Amino acid sequence: MTNSGYNSSRLGFKGVEDLGGGLKAKFWLEAGVNNDDGSGSATNVNNQATGGALAGMNGSQGLTFNRTSYVSLIGNSGEIRLGRDYSPQFWSFTVYDPFGTNGVGTTQALNSSAGGVTIVRASNSVAYISPNMSGFVVWGQMYFGENASNAASQAGDGGAARVQYDNGPLSLAAAYSKTTTGAGTDVQSTNIAGSYNMGVAQLIGFWNKDANTGAKDVTGYTIGALVPVAPAGTVRVSFSNSDNGAGAKTDKFALGYVHDLSKRTALYGTFASLSNSGGAAQALNGAITPANGSSTGFDLGVRHAF
């Protein structure tokens, strides 16, 4: 048994205070919860692969606000955030994947495996999010590894930017991030995505590239659709490909259905199949998969939000 096959299980607190004159103060604290066993999830304090995590996932650290922990000021000119938050380039992974970033259907793990520690979230960040400007929203972020100024490496320092355009049924986005990983090394992530809602179906496309210093570029793409089934169901389907630039490739197909019992409760089921070639050994949700092997997986569950 596992959790978060449809949405990530979480417990959080957020609030907004009206300061007057069009200015608001906001806070957001959100902790990941593994509701199948009651454990919490580790956070990362310095955006680095070593020395950053408080403990291994599901470890003795208990509950941490690993998902979100920031304060912000919001005004007519946009929002400024300080703390731990999503990386702007990650947002397209969840917006433009029919399966979001959860369960056997998602391609997030498949197509961001080379993106480094800050591929999803960054600690010690300063971000600006613009207001909607004729359909355009711009999101810029800088984050820091909190190393000594004279350290040989400024690992964990970096930045990201994202622009999204929405106009009726059309949605487009592009994003880029760069994070220092060591002395003279970094990881750069780029993605371009879009969707078009035809009414009978929402068509979705996504492309990404991760570039690590001294390694081949890893590229991937996803095409898929969301098909509403009246009155309370949605069929989800996607095909994805990942290529590590050295001949290792992975193809993945996913098909799922979500049935809303109410605004807060839904039943879901997903089937996914993955195949590797050229020495690739990608897996579904950690399943043991040998090089050039394949795996299949199923999700059946219930999501309740409160």
Task: Describe each model-derived feature in a short phrase.
Residues 1-145, 155, 164-171:
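Outer membrane beta-barrel
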Residues 3-6, 61-63, 118-120, 153-155, ...:
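Short sequence motifs at beta-strands and strand-loop junctions characteristic
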Residues 10-12, 68-70, 125-127, 160, ...:
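Membrane-embedded beta-strand positions in outer-membrane beta-barrel channels/transporters
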Residues 24-28, 79-83, 137-139, 171-173, ...:
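Residue-level detector of the transmembrane beta-barrel scaffold of outer-membrane proteins
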Residues 32-36, 82, 87-91, 145-147, ...:
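Structural signature of outer-membrane beta-barrel domains
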Residues 55-57, 148, 210-211, 241-243, ...:
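Extracellular loop and loop/strand-boundary signature of outer-membrane beta-barrel proteins
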Residues 154-260, 272-273:
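Detector for outer-membrane/organellar transmembrane beta-barrel domains
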Residues 259-261, 293-306:
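Outer-membrane beta-barrel "beta-signal"
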